[in-house]
Amino acid sequence: MENKQQHRWVLYILLVIISIFMLFPVLWVISSSLKPSTELFAWPPSIFPNEITLNNYISAFQNANFGRYLFNTVFVTITATIITLIINTMAGYALAKYRFRGSTIILVFFLSTLMIPLEALMIPMFIVLKNLGLYNTLWGVIIPPAATPTGVFLVRQYIMSIPDEMIEAAKIDGASDWKIFVRLILPLAKPILATLTIFSLMWRWQDYIWPLIAISDSNLYTLELALANFVGEYSVDWGPLLAMAVLTMIPLITVFLLFQRFFIRGIMMSGMKD
């Protein structure tokens, strides 16, 4: 019993040490964003600011057009997440509960796209984007990555854990396929929908490569593009840049804290039935 207690304490100490190493860069960014510019490069460096100031955050909104970039990112993220949920949920439900010839082949085809490097898809996706007239628009950032094989697979695996008898009972009661999907499947699939929501929000909020290709107008930049372009050729205004980085992190952390219970449950349930 004592050995178990000792092992547990050792494990806790290791987890605390690892957590400190993981969180230190984040804490440093937050602390540095509250420092005046003269203190950022002072020697010896200090973890906590001697003088707290919000000038960096004010400058980010007034001089760096942060509000515009934030609006673009929120619009892209929320719209893309809604489209992703609709497409992936319907596709996952069809592959999980509908028996038709070629369903396994379609699933394998979806999953096989995960083995193709994203860079190999960029040129054909860009050509299609330009031919459709979506280049240099926010919709050009939203639509192409909407259907994700990872999302389809997760939803399909979770819905397979729902007993077929429930669907058959609903059909006996006269429910249509659409009513079964909306009134039965979606409420039962809340955990995996929350998981997919978190994944989609993270993917779209942090996406850099595809917006870089699909957008050239600086007024349409997302936060990731804005942060990258905030670095000048000869100098970097570190104060506002750090403030923008902190403001960029807050929404993702908030979403994860709100949905983490569903997130963990959804991931666990997705692998329960093959």
Segment roles from a protein language model:
Residues 2-274:
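A structural signal for multi-pass alpha-helical bundles of membrane permease subunits
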